[in-house]
Amino acid sequence: TDAQERARGITIFSKQALLEMPGLSVTLLDTPGHVDFSAEAERTLQVLDCAILVVSGSEGLQGHTLTLWKLLARYRVPVLLFVNKMDLPGPGRAALMEQLKARLAPGCTDFGQPEAARNEELALCGEDLMEDFLEAGSLSGEAIAAGVAARRVFPCFFGSALKLDGLDELLAALPRFVQAPAYGQHFSAAVYKVARDPKGERLTFLKITGGALEARALLSGQGDPAQGGEPWQEKVSQIRLYSGAKFTAAERAEAGQVCAVTGLTHTWPGEGLGLRPDAPAPMLEPAMTYQVLLDDGQDPHEALQKLRQLAEEDPQLHISWDEETRQIR
């Protein structure tokens, strides 16, 4: 965990963890929930197979939760909801469900209610679900999973993460109600993050969305359009599978895997590699402009170089140099 994250008690940088569950391997990508770091969250959404949106059970839906919901809709990400902090005073389960249905989607369904009542509710989420329900009197896991994948069904779970209440039900739902995407045979990948390891080595985090990637493979792409978009061709030095701060080196990453690679110096968040197109321009844009004030005696060009390194990791910084005023903005 980053020192700033520990000090503030929040997530600032997206991180990943590898989890092995019965019949399922999961890569968990933890994204910032704080409004100030929304851009980091948006960059990660494009590589998700499914999202778990955490809602405060004590406060209900908040403005930033609605922003995240719009982003998930934009990137067509299937969503499960976990209503947290149910151990604290709040509106209550019934009132929260009404709020979710009214402000998010009618397909938000309480998966903690009796199965018969749940299936009756789910049958209203689509003609195919209604037909299956009328024919069989129930709904199969496959039918519900198809509704989740189509973003017509949004399973809702309630509990308290601090007290580990409700988590077993949420985790058990993943293999039952979340479909694994189908991937093509030819290589494609989505770059969602650029960072540096403790030694300063540049890391390109990407999800393989087709085929496979091998260490020492030669990749090519087009540079960041904001920086001129020059074509590049470079070799992958190492493939790393991260879980927290630790990683294992791999010779190959398959479709569906999230990994970090070294050796690439021109990649940028949102870039598509292989057959993958570049991501659309981000929906969230900075609203304020700041001037960087340096201490007396500091070299502005040296500071600019370091800030541009940060801008590789967060393109929304939009670092610029005004030659006339010799100011960094």
Language-model features: locations:
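Structural and coupling elements of P-loop NTPases
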Residues: 1-329
